[in-house]
Swiss-Prot record:
It holds the Pfam family GspL_C. It comes from Pseudomonas aeruginosa (strain ATCC 15692 / DSM 22644 / CIP 104116 / JCM 14847 / LMG 12228 / 1C / PRS 101 / PAO1). Residues 1-233 are cytoplasmic. The gene is xcpY. SUPFAM superfamilies: Actin-like ATPase domain. This is Type II secretion system protein L. One of its GO terms (biological process) is protein secretion by the type II secretion system. It is a single-pass membrane protein. The chain crosses the membrane at residues 234-254.
């Protein structure tokens, strides 16, 4: 059990959750006493919370089924007659099977337990497990342990309770042998029971014993798990925010690329209509343009014209601010003269450079400014 801290709620905790209530807590083999809120601030995770047996009803019942999926559903009906309180108000935890086939069951007020856990969760220190102090006593038979001015009674039998020395003669005959007791040397021994003296701190000793049933079951099991995840919420929130931003950026980028593609397609279609005004229906620009090239491949000057235009169309279509106002073809010289208009001289120069890089012979004639645009004669081929 080393490495796991432990916090013990005293019998007075049955009055209700109180951050100022003094509790004992064990860490690194040392026991300290402090208000519950202060202990939470100092305790190191993971840690176990020990409930006083006074807050818990322990009983042993016969369950109608051994199938795990039905056991929890049958618990309220099996223990209802053994509880003084309304079973609907109780949190039920299923323990191990006893030698006689019955199952140990623990019942604790749901609102009481939830209130103490809420204090721990509010401090960001939810316990890793929940145990009953009297359920963690070792050995076969009956085991008694002196803690906080009362005897805890546990062991391999069904009984889990706290009692005074004066109650032992009444309980002794119903407790299975062997009967053992552990206490500090100054504690008065019980009648008929050999008490083994403890030299160390009793809370440290109890925290080192094998654990009993973990009461963090059903809705409280989910509560403990959610508390463990709560520490990761800030990081998960950042990851989620990053994913949302990345998704939004991708959508915006796709939308922009779609718009850019639509714009290029519209410019290519406009250029095609200028070159082939007789084609009134434009269904597949690339296929129709290739068809014109194929039809006129052997038709002399027209084939040469279409060949030059086929090479230049992609480059010119990539400059959305450039428009072709006039086209002149000279079969004798083997060139195409385009009268183009652009918003500036730099755009014309960029167009000339791109045409040259595509393998075309290009000459840019003198350009003149007309208002906010520039007009120039562009000769391709020759």
């Amino acid at each position: 059990m080393s490495g796991v801290s432990a916090l013990f709620l005293p019998p007075a905790s049955t009055a209700g959750a109180d951050g100022e209530l003094a509790v004992w807590w064990v860490q690194d083999g040392e026991c300290r006493r402090a208000p519950f809120a202060q202990a939470l601030a100092e305790i190191r995770a993971p840690w176990r919370l020990y409930l006083p047996v006074e807050a818990v009803t322990a009983c042993a019942v016969n369950l109608p089924t051994q199938k795990a999926r039905w056991l929890r559903q049958s618990l309220p009906f099996a223990v209802e007659e053994q509880l003084a309180d309304d079973v609907e108000q109780m949190h039920l935890a299923l323990g191990p099977a006893l030698a006689d086939g019955r199952h140990r069951v623990f019942a604790v007020q749901r609102t009481w337990l939830a209130a103490w856990l809420a204090l721990a969760e509010g401090a960001g220190k939810a316990p890793a497990s929940l145990h009953v102090d009297a359920d963690c006593l070792p050995g076969e038979g009956s085991c008694l342990f002196w803690l906080e001015e009362r005897w805890l009674l546990g062991g391999s039998g069904a009984v889990r309770l706290a009692c005074g020395s004066e109650d032992w003669p009444v309980l002794r005959d119903s407790c299975p042998p062997p009967q053992r007791a552990f206490a500090a040397q100054e504690v008065a021994p019980l009648e008929g029971v050999e008490v083994q003296a403890l030299a160390g701190n009793p809370h440290v000793w109890l925290s080192e014993q094998p654990l009993g049933t973990d009461l963090a079951q059903a809705e409280f099991a989910a509560r403990q798990q959610s508390s463990q995840w709560r520490r990761w919420r800030p990081l998960l929130g950042l990851v989620g925010l990053w994913l949302v931003l990345q998704w939004g950026f991708t959508l915006v980028q796709a939308w922009q690329l779609q718009r850019e593609g639509d714009r290029y397609a519209a410019q290519s279609a406009e250029l095609y209509r200028q070159l082939f005004p007789e084609d009134r229906k434009l269904i597949n620009l690339r296929a129709q343009f290739d068809q014109h090239l194929a039809d006129s491949a052997s038709s002399g000057g027209e084939g040469q014209l279409l060949g030059l235009l086929g090479q230049a169309a992609t480059v010119i279509g990539g400059e959305p601010t450039v428009s072709v106002e006039q086209l002149d073809f000279s079969a004798a010289r083997g060139d195409v003269a385009l009268q183009v208009r652009a918003p500036g001289f730099d755009v014309l120069e960029r167009l000339r450079s791109r045409l040259s890089e595509s393998g075309l012979a290009v000459q840019l004639g003198s350009a003149s400014r007309d208002g906010s645009t520039v007009s120039a004669r562009l000769v391709i081929g020759g």
